[in-house]
Amino acid sequence: MNIHEYQAKRLLHTYGAPIANGVAVYSVEQAEEWAKTLPGPLYVVKSQIHAGGRGKGKFKELPADAKGGVRLAKSVEEVVANAKEMLGNTLVTKQTGPAGKQVNRLYIEDGADIDRELYLSILIDRTVGRPAFVVSTEGGMDIEAVAEETPEKIVTVAIDPAKGVTDEDASKLADALKLEGQAREDGVKLFPILYKAFTEKDMSLLEINPLIVMTDGRVRVLDAKVSFDGNALFRHPDIQELRDLSEEDEKEIEASKYDLAYVALDGNIGCMVNGAGLAMATMDIIKLYGAEPANFLDVGGGASKEKVTAAFKIITADPAVQGILVNIFGGIMKCDVIAEGVIAAVKEVGLKVPLVVRLEGTNVELGKKIINESGLNVISADDLDDAAQKIVAAVKGN
């Protein structure tokens, strides 16, 4: 689960992280009212959407030379003028895709006199099985570009969960970020604060880009992105209250109601698979044969007929889908259950696109019999390679 920048910063501030004074607003009137409560004279007006690259993003409704989703203002009047342009309009960034996201709230905060911009994140390093800090002196920019062009400027420090952030860890991080004097003191205090927030709130990612050193030598969290482990949300009702459903894909919300692992993508071939590994392999082979998957969808090992029906309906609800591939290897999951679910869904919503079904494993013959006797126009496949070629050919034939 993701939250907005202002929510992330407020959460980190409760642990003691230094942030600027700021207010979240939902209207131009609120922007004017609350901006007057900030010290000024420099303000930053930030679009609040669940996507990165806001500063370099562009609003669909504005001229091409208009400013992006993060803007500086030197007066309350400029804050208001920017709010009028930003609220209600669609911001397109490298992470939103061409559709963009509508900006329904802004975060207005005090400006800062910046000396240096740094990068810091905490995530789970699965190669060592521990939380790890990833830091770089190249903050305020695309960390992926830094990793590709100058990987030596990125430093990773794994943390022993039994010890937490030790003095040695903090010193390594301060050295990697080249912090000196007051900035080093602030950093050494901040690192364990961030780690505590990360672990106590079951975060999967905590990213600060940039973490700034101001001209007075103090360190401040200037931007924050936080994602939480969805499997641990039951422990954190306070975090669940921060969820903004308007920022989430409607199909993904519906899938979560049935405990389906669904991620919307930009392609045109819908996929329903059991098992994350097989689902990824299915998407790979679709791309291999020149098409693009419309989604990742893992129905899991013990799905019921109702769950399979819901999964199929979610796929067909995507107008971009021009074909569907059902790829099931039955272990715990039984092929006849998949067949019954698919047939029930098709009878309810209709079938307007080609459907290829590949079944293998438990009750496979019964599953194939159910589909063959259903009277539906279903294309059978013998294996994954055959299934991928058939669905790609069927879609391109349309």
Curated annotation (Swiss-Prot):
Catalytic activity, reaction form: succinate + ATP + CoA = succinyl-CoA + ADP + phosphate; GTP + succinate + CoA = succinyl-CoA + GDP + phosphate
UniProt cofactor(s): Mg(2+)
Pfam family, one: ATP-grasp_2
One GO location term (cellular component): cytosol
Pathway: Carbohydrate metabolism; tricarboxylic acid cycle; succinate from succinyl-CoA (ligase route): step 1/1
Homology family: Belongs to the succinate/malate CoA ligase beta subunit family.
Description of how the protein assembles with itself and partners: Heterotetramer of two alpha and two beta subunits.
Summary of the function given for this chain in its UniProt record: Succinyl-CoA synthetase functions in the citric acid cycle (TCA), coupling the hydrolysis of succinyl-CoA to the synthesis of either ATP or GTP and thus represents the only step of substrate-level phosphorylation in the TCA. The beta subunit provides nucleotide specificity of the enzyme and binds the substrate succinate, while the binding sites for coenzyme A and phosphate are found in the alpha subunit.
Name of this protein: Succinate--CoA ligase [ADP-forming] subunit beta
